């Protein structure tokens, strides 16, 4: 990535100045590892640079150690990804994509006609199926799958923190949240010896009706075994977004503010009940 090239250039600059015995060799080895994408995380690079810093302090009276520390600070700040990216998609898109995949693989002829509890049951039962991320699907389904595969690639190359949050706009049901978890998992199921895609799923409740139902939706979700596994991955932390603009269009300024206030109270109480941060 361009950020790693910047780190490589910084190291080259250090190598030209730090020609001390034992230091030059360390910097050369670090530069080669960056050039060949050998570092799996920024913490590994920092560990190697700290060895350089320690050696300078112990053997060369700390000469130029400030330059190495400056680079360490830069890497601590920007890691391998510079800034975090969020992914956002409308729940209606996920619904269409899941319906297409299930229909094309003969798992369900018409997912959209299922009742909510039937959708939950089907998604829970098929979430570990392999071979679902590749198929003769619609362009929309292929685009969503490709997006998730791209996120996995970016996470593998730049660290899990580079892209973590997946925001579901217009969340209106338990299924609309599970559909994203299901899509992410079917991508993971078909990975061959690669790091797993990891998403922090963030429901966004926007309309007055959805804000009113938010706590009921989340309570049902918290009690589902497949979502409990996801909560465990995130140390029982759950981010929830409450939208203002759609609520204003739906019920007006005062109604939207009141609905958000009430939703916050109920969701906070629910989180405490289930020991969720």
Residue locations for each model-derived region?
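Extended, charge-enriched "interface" segments that sit outside catalytic cores
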Residues: 1-157
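A conserved P-loop NTPase coupling/switch region
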Residues: 191-199
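Active-site cores of enzymes that catalyze phosphoryl transfer or operate on phosphate-rich substrates
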Residues: 83-85, 90-178, 182, 186-190, ...
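Alpha-helical scaffold elements within enzyme catalytic domains, especially in hydrolases
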Residues: 74, 266-270
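Short glycine-rich or small-residue beta-strand-to-loop segments that form or flank ligand, phosphate
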Residues: 35, 53, 166-169, 201-204
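Structured mid-domain segments that build the active-site/substrate or prosthetic-cofactor binding neighborhood
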Residues: 1-2, 269-277
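Beta-sheet entry/capping signal
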Residues: 72-73, 80-84, 161-166, 198-202, ...
């Amino acid at each position: 990535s361009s950020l790693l090239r910047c780190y490589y250039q910084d190291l080259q600059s250090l190598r030209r100045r730090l020609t001390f015995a034992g230091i030059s060799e360390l910097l050369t080895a670090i530069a080669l590892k960056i050039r060949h994408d050998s570092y799996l995380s920024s913490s590994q690079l920092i560990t190697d640079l700290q060895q350089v810093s320690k050696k300078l302090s112990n053997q060369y009276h700390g000469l130029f150690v400030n330059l190495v520390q400056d680079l360490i600070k830069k890497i601590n700040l920007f890691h391998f990804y510079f800034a975090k990216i969020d992914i956002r998609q409308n729940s209606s898109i996920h619904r269409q994509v899941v319906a297409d995949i299930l229909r094309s693989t003969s798992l369900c002829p018409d997912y959209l006609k299922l009742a909510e509890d039937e959708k939950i049951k089907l998604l829970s039962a098929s979430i570990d199926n392999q071979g679902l991320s590749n198929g003769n699907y619609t362009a929309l389904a292929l685009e969503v799958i490709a997006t998730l595969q791209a996120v996995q690639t970016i996470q593998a190359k730049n660290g899990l923190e580079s892209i973590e949050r997946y925001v579901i706009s217009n969340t209106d049901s338990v299924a609309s949240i599970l559909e994203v978890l299901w899509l992410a998992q079917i991508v993971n199921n078909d990975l061959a010896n690669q790091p797993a895609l990891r998403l922090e799923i963030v429901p966004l409740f926007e309309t007055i009706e959805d804000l009113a139902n938010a706590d009921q939706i989340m309570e049902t979700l918290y009690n589902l075994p497949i979502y409990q596994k996801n909560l465990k991955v995130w140390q029982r932390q759950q981010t929830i977004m409450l939208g203002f603009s759609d609520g204003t269009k739906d019920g007006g300024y005062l109604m939207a503010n009141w609905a958000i206030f009430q939703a916050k109270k109920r969701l906070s109480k629910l989180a405490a009940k289930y020991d969720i941060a």
